[in-house]
Amino acid sequence: MGIIRAVNLIFDYIRHDEEHEKEEINHALRGVSLDIEEGSFVAILGHNGSGKSTFAKLMNGILLPSDGTVYIADMKTSDEEHLWDVRKTAGMVFQNPDNQIIGNVVEEDVGFGPENMGVPTEEIWERVDKSLNAVGMTAYRLQSPNKLSGGQKQRVAIAGVMAMKPRCIVLDEPTAMLDPNGRREVIKTIHELNRQEGITVLLITHYMEEVIDADRVVVMDGGQVVMDGTPKEVFSRVSDLKKYRLDVPQVTELAYELKQAGMELSDGILTIEELVDELAEKLS
């Protein structure tokens, strides 16, 4: 059994008119089932409106399914008595770090979550130290978050979630508002947490380059899972990804075009090094 289990999830956004009658129903999720193993790094891809962000919000009880069940460490998110434990187990990081950072000083913000959990003061500071060190933000602990770059703010937001000692972190497009440098530093931080701390990562994104090193890639379209496999397996299906209005990494696209032109290359090339090695072999 995985740390996260989604069983036949259905979620509908319902819009009401002025008389509170149902006016429109948007079927955001249509029978999604996923089992995510503890310690894994899973990326969920999809264009806008695919259902991926709705799925993320169901993972720690921000939203509850219209039908189906979400289990976090065998706890149902729909059981109110378990909701606090669910949110301690599966921490959430959002697109905009400004919506998540509330402290006037970095270290105070990181300690806010553990303090509200009733953690003893001495342990709070131990957690703050460890979390800031893990995301490479110790040198900024006494600074105002307002003076940080977007990437630094997002790392502080991740540290704040880490300080609550979750077993899993759900990141809903955490790099969407960042420049390329900010995106790289945040993704590097997330991978280090996964490898060094053993934290399960569920990354929601539409940036193809961010998922190359994931253990597993899930593609959503129209509220359903349409592809599921390793990065190499998923990116081997370039024409299918284009059908779902998704791009592929630039090097994968180049290899695909060369293959379409008649060159014999492997499917699912993900790095420049892979492509160079194959071309060198073909041309030698």
Model-derived features with residue positions:
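The feature captures the beta-strand-to-loop junction immediately N-terminal to the Walker
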Residues: 45-47
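Conserved ABC ATPase signature
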Residues: 144-148, 152
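Helix-to-loop junction immediately C-terminal to a conserved catalytic motif
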Residues: 60
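Conserved ABC ATPase "signature" region
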Residues: 122-140
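Catalytic Walker B motif of ABC-type/P-loop ATPase nucleotide-binding domains
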Residues: 169-172
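Conserved ABC transporter NBD signature motif
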Residues: 68-78, 86
